[in-house]
Amino acid sequence: MNANNSYLNLKINKLDFKITKAVIKESLDQIFLCECEGFYENINNDIFSDDNIEFDPNMLIDKEASLIIKNPYENKKIDFSTNIDMIYKGIISYVEYLGVNQGSVSNIVKENFKQLNHKHFFKFNLHSPLIRLDFNKANRIYTHTNIIEAIKQTLAYYNTKLNKNIDFSNIHHIYETKELISQYNESDLEFITRLAHNHGIYFYEDKDNIYFYDFYTHKGKTKDIVFNPNINNHLNEACIYALNKEKQIQTNAFTHSSNNSKQPLSLYSLSTKAQNTNTHYNEHYYESEYSFTQNINLKQSPTLKEKRNSMLNNTLKAKSNIYHLSLNESIKINIQKETTKEYTIIAKEQILIDDAILANTINTNDNLNIKDLNLSKSYTNNLTLIPSFLTFTPSFKSKPKPPINTMGMVIGEDSNIENQRNTIYTDEYGRVKVRINLYANQEELDNKTNMYHHSPFLRVASNVASNHSGFYHTPRIGDEVIISFLDDDIDKPFISGSLYNGVN
């Protein structure tokens, strides 16, 4: 590969930057980030003149960009099946201008350059376009829908900003309808990540699509990878050259005296060491027949925690020089002649260096020989693998902490409160419909004030609620009510009281 031809290029608008160093981090647990440094050659020394306004960081930030990785090896005969280009498409989330360096005259003569170019050096962060969902926090409420539809509705706000297809074709499970799904003081990215991960759904992207999975199904041909632990791989054989296993101490079961809050598995008796079916997971349950509502608990289930624990126990770390491996891809590793195991890539960190293209960029007053600069061209990656018989289970996300109390207004069947004021409107269980003040901005911005799916039916607390006895009152349309949250859960609001005001 010619010293002046980089195997790394970053294209922003119509500008083509040569990249000298890049670190790319991607995982099924979080969106990808690429931190890179490179330069753009320009005949002008002052790149920020009026004639070069396109180089101003203000013109580069938040622009779509593509990082293109070509085969990094001199030996093109290495069988990568095809010498494909790996492309990462995202947006520029950070720009820093590092300065200008003029090429060495002596080296320019050797390279037969006909004109004097100036290298203007920049530092960039290339982020997944999903980072645009993380810029602002929002309060929203969804009723009578499931988590998949809530995710789709949230993503629909960004139809013109993602510029990638959203693919839900790998969602195989059926998700029950929730009476209430709340987003409180969360960015849209935090919200869809919490909903997805707490239900065992993960998402990732390639250059054209964003994929959602809840069950891994392999597509395409499985790549056969050689395991070669020899550090003297002078021919740059495409291989995995290191495999490591990590393990940290943790409790593996419940007992009556202690439990592991991070990884609850099956419940065991302290004395018998056998599963005790009479012992229950330490969490409150509210059955629908008693609470007049479907299960609105959006916390992760012990089953998912068990799946994640099993996945973590079978995770492997690997190092390779194979540049064309993709996230969520299945590979077969030939550890020995008769031993082949299949794995799925769940995380990848790539370190790419190509400062050999700077060979003609030295200060002529340094009297330093080019061969002493230790310039290099290299590629390596760190992989996280799980056996292919396991499905990736993402880490769990905690819910936002709700306010202690908030206000709300009882409303009726439509938005005309004045005509219905002081009348009673309930559902079949005696619950009243409330417009919660937390979500008033959502209704105003969406221009859907008092719409049904923004105003849930809530239960009303009472001093005494016994069989055939107790206190009972029903807040009327137009009443101001106090909203509290059961178990400090944003998805479990109820009416804890009412307030007099100037109207009533």
Descriptions of predicted regions:
Residues 1-504:
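Amphipathic alpha-helical and helix-coil boundary elements used as assembly
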